[in-house]
């Protein structure tokens, strides 16, 4: 059997869109066949039927009404499918044989612009990634076709670089060079939910000069070769899917990776910049606190500012000064916010115009928005800060476009472009004449109705209209006998009435319908002319939209600063950050007002380079560390900060290692993920970076974890190429020994108060290390049953005693084995231990194994815990440690523990 002509046409079209679900237009429906039908029926919950296609088996089929297609398309795209829209491209009335059909658009997650599915305050990005494998370089191009943003960059071909940019832009779709390393492709796939397509190298490299010149003109000439190739693939993909060149994409913003603060994927999540960790929603994020913008454009711009903090001091200062000016003039800023409030999303209206799907209501929204600009410009006319002065100078009031739309488009136009009722009276003479003819015709119909009622005496007689029969005279059957013979021609019989026509009625009908059809067609053509004229000024409109968005951000930051008691930070590049009474802007927003406990911070490249923070869980260590990072980031987007005073040193990167999470899909345990994150930090941080490390080493055994944490601290502080500012929270109290041993390490802890065997977290960061972890008390606060709490205390006491006894037993063995070594060291006796008692076990300590110490002075008080040296510091350091032991301050148990540690250290040096 042979395929039917229509199915042959279907397969010919489908052959070019194998990766899409093909919506095949048949009359008033989009039909899907074969595998597409099965997929669509499953995903959209449609009834799967069949259709004769010329094969032995019927073709699986399902369909949707074309007028309701948007919701179905949106659901498929949201699930990661591509949808190819195949339309009838000729009028079936004039078709000879099968109606011509062709795909007019391919809708994908990255190119879908329907306002019902694209969030107003988020960009809908699509990204291409190209690589020169020989030179180990990569380039990325990113666009949002709904706004016209088009960005590009290049850098080293490193996984971290690519994943950081993906996490920053969060694209809905990514087009990859298919020769990229398979491990990198796997990492990208695991990092993002974006729809990923792979293209051959030719897609990136062929015809790039021609393609880019057609899209951007001479602006593309200055681009680097790498950027040209990634941009080429992106422009091609837009042309392949949209089937037209989008005029709102008319410029490329090339940025350098060093122009903005680097924040990796893990840090973006941990700091909850734009969404919270739990629900992945905006509420509870920094953006939630900061975003009180008046426009969708401003909200998207603010999101981008948060994702891309500045690192240039001068640019940061420009924003801060502009925010300060509006902050200091409440009345001015209130007026500005009010003026911005009624401005619609100009960027996305321009996207619709560029994509040829803007209707008359979109143009009215554009006109309304343009009409607000003179007021906005007037409000900031006398501003003195450089940024606001520049906005005023460059803000185009677009008066010519406003005047065109004001005199041409009706205030409440039809939603459907081909139904007329779009153009104002007086704009076009021919339209006015056709409307007059249409109005006169309706008057004539009304006159005819009255005349026939009088002639027949039938008061219920009426003249009606429908699209099938046109105009008719309707008379009820009850009055049928009153109809004069031969006056009317019967047209239709109803249950309770008869419908008639007359030659005169059909004549006026022809004139009326002709005028209506011609009027609708003429209005449509004139509307397209007006829309095209607006499109000719898309450069000016885009520039104005960007200024409005930035102005909205500045005004918003001033408003939020006033609302939340933020202050203007000072900014420096000398490496020291000082924060007085700093607060976490999100946490203080979600707890009762006035309950947040502020904290000070001093961190620099010298004596306060690495802050070791100890204290119990739930005491506020993680909140404190995050707040330092967020205050720094807020400053670098140009925002005021939650503190009473702040002097922030510009950082180039923020890294965080906070929280625990498995990477099951990637085959990595919690500890492996933690080590990977630490490795990434140590490799990529610089002396100008800010690093937050929380509980490094907790995912393994105690001594392994302690060893790793200790070594990481040493590496950060002693590596001349690193020495980054670091906040290091830990439960390893042994690490507090490093203050004084390693330059730059300082101990801090979270204050805790004990009242009647209960603990109270004071949330205050104080100098000095914590003396215990309070883990059982935290468990009690969390609601663990008393029976479990009491048993935990018993077990803890037992473990502590066993641990102490084991240490003493080991000490005895080590000391007996090393007696001669100790005596040869010429160490004099300074303290004698007679005996000690551990529960029921009595352990006698002989005089010959008593610890001896040198006569050197005591420098500092010693911690009462074992000092474990994992770095083999050498004989000089051992002698120094011995000289610093204050034997008189130690009890017998502590003395033995101390002796054991020193002997073990001495043996390692042999």
Swiss-Prot record:
ATP binds at residues 615-622. GO terms for cellular component: cytosol. CDD domains: ABC_MutS1 (cd03284). Keywords: ATP-binding, DNA damage, DNA repair, DNA-binding, Nucleotide-binding. GO terms for molecular function: ATP binding; ATP-dependent DNA damage sensor activity; damaged DNA binding; mismatched DNA binding. InterPro entries: DNA_mismatch_repair_MutS, DNA_mismatch_repair_MutS-lik_N, DNA_mismatch_repair_MutS/MSH, DNA_mismatch_repair_MutS_C, DNA_mismatch_repair_MutS_clamp, DNA_mismatch_repair_MutS_core, DNA_mismatch_repair_MutS_N, DNA_mismatch_repair_MutS_sf. One of its GO terms (biological process) is mismatch repair. This protein is involved in the repair of mismatches in DNA. It is possible that it carries out the mismatch recognition step. This protein has a weak ATPase activity. NCBIfam families: mutS1, PRK05399.1. Belongs to the DNA mismatch repair MutS family. This is DNA mismatch repair protein MutS. The gene is mutS.
């Amino acid at each position: 059997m042979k395929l039917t002509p229509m199915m042959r046409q279907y397969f010919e079209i489908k052959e070019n869109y194998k990766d899409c679900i093909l919506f095949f237009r048949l009359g008033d429906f989009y039909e899907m066949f074969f595998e597409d039908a099965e997929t669509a029926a499953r995903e959209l919950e449609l009834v799967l039927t069949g259709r004769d296609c010329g094969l032995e088996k019927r073709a699986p089929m399902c369909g949707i009404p074309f007028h309701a297609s948007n919701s179905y398309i949106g659901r498929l795209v949201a699930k990661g499918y591509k949808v190819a829209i195949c339309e009838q491209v000729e009028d079936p009335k004039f078709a000879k044989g099968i109606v011509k059909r062709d795909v007019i658009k391919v809708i994908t997650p990255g190119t879908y612009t329907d306002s019902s599915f694209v969030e107003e305050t988020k960009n809908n990005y699509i990204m291409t990634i190209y690589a020169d494998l020989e030179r180990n370089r990569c380039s990325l191009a990113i666009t949002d076709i709904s706004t016209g943003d088009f960005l590009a960059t290049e850098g080293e071909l490193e996984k971290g670089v690519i994943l950081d940019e993906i996490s920053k832009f969060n694209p809905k779709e990514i087009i990859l060079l298919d020769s990229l390393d398979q491990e990198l492709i796997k990492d990208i796939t695991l990092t993002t939910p974006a729809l990923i397509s792979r293209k051959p190298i030719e897609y990136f490299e062929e015809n790039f000069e021609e393609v880019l010149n057609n899209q951007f003109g001479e602006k593309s000439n200055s681009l680097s070769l790498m950027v040209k190739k990634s941009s080429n693939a992106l422009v091609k993909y837009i042309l392949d899917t949209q089937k037209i060149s989008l005029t709102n994409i008319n410029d490329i913003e090339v940025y350098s990776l060093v122009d903005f603060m680097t924040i990796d994927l893990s840090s973006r999540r941990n700091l909850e910049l734009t969404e919270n960790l739990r629900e992945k929603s905006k509420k509870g994020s920094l953006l939630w606190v900061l975003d009180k913008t008046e426009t969708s454009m401003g909200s998207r711009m603010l999101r981008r500012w948060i994702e891309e903090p500045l690192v240039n001091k001068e640019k940061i200062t420009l924003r801060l000064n502009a925010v300060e000016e509006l902050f200091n003039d409440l009345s001015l800023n209130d007026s500005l916010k009010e003026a911005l409030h009624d401005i619609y999303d100009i960027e996305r209206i321009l996207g619709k115009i560029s994509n040829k799907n803007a209707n008359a209501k979109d143009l009215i929204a554009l006109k309304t928005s343009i009409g607000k600009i003179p007021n906005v410009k007037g409000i900031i006319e006398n501003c003195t800060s450089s940024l606001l002065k520049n906005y005023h100078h460059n803000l185009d009031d677009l008066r010519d476009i406003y005047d065109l739309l004001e005199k041409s488009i009706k205030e409440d136009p039809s939603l459907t472009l081909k139904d007329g009722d779009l153009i104002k009276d007086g704009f076009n003479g021919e339209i006015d004449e056709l409307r007059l003819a249409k109005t006169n015709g309706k008057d004539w119909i009304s006159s005819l109705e009255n005349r026939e009622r009088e002639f027949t005496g039938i008061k219920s007689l009426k003249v009606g209209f429908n699209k099938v029969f046109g105009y008719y005279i309707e008379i009820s059957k009850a009055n049928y006998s009153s109809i004069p013979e031969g006056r009317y021609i019967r047209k239709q019989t109803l249950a309770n009435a008869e419908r008639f026509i007359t030659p005169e009625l059909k004549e006026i009908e022809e004139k009326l319908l002709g005028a209506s059809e011609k009027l609708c067609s003429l209005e449509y053509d004139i509307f397209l002319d007006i829309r095209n004229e607006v499109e000719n000024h898309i450069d000016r409109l885009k520039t104005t939209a960007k200024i409005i968005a930035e102005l909205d951000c500045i005004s918003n930051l001033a408003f939020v600063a006033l609302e939340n008691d933020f202050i203007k930070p000072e900014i420096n590049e000398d490496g020291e950050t000082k924060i007085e009474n700093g607060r976490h802007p999100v946490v203080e927003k979600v707890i009762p007002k006035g309950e947040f406990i502020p904290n000070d911070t001093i961190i620099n490249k010298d004596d306060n380079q690495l802050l070791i923070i100890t204290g119990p869980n739930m005491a506020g260590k993680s909140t404190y560390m995050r707040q330092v990072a967020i205050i720094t980031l807020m400053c670098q987007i140009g925002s005021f900060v939650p503190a009473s005073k702040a002097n922030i040193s510009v950082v180039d990167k923020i890294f965080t290692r906070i929280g625990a999470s498995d990477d099951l899909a990637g085959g990595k345990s919690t500890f492996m993920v933690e080590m990977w994150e630490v490795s990434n930090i140590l490799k990529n941080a610089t002396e100008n970076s800010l690093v937050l490390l929380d509980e490094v080493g907790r995912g393994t055994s105690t001594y392994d974890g302690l060893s790793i944490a200790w070594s990481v601290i040493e590496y950060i502080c002693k590596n001349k190429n690193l020495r980054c500012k670091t906040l290091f929270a830990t439960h390893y109290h042994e690490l507090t020994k490093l203050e004084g041993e390693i330059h730059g390490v300082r101990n801090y802890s979270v204050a805790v108060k004990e009242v009647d065997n209960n603990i109270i977290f004071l949330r205050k960061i104080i100098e000095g290390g914590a003396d215990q972890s309070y883990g059982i008390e935290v468990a009690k606060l969390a609601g663990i049953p008393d029976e479990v709490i009491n048993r935990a205390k018993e077990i803890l006491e037992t473990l502590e005693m066993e641990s102490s006894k084991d240490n003493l037993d080991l000490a005895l063995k080590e000391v007996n084995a090393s007696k001669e070594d100790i005596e040869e060291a010429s160490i004099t006796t300074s303290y004698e231990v007679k005996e000690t008692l551990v529960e029921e076990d009595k352990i006698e300590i002989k005089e010959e194994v008593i610890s001896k110490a040198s006569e050197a002075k005591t420098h500092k008080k010693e911690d009462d815990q074992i000092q474990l040296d994992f770095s083999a510091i050498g004989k000089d350091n051992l002698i120094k440690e011995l000289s610093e032991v204050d034997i008189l301050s130690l009890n017998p148990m502590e003395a033995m523990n101390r002796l054991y540690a020193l002997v073990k250290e001495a043996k390692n040096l042999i």
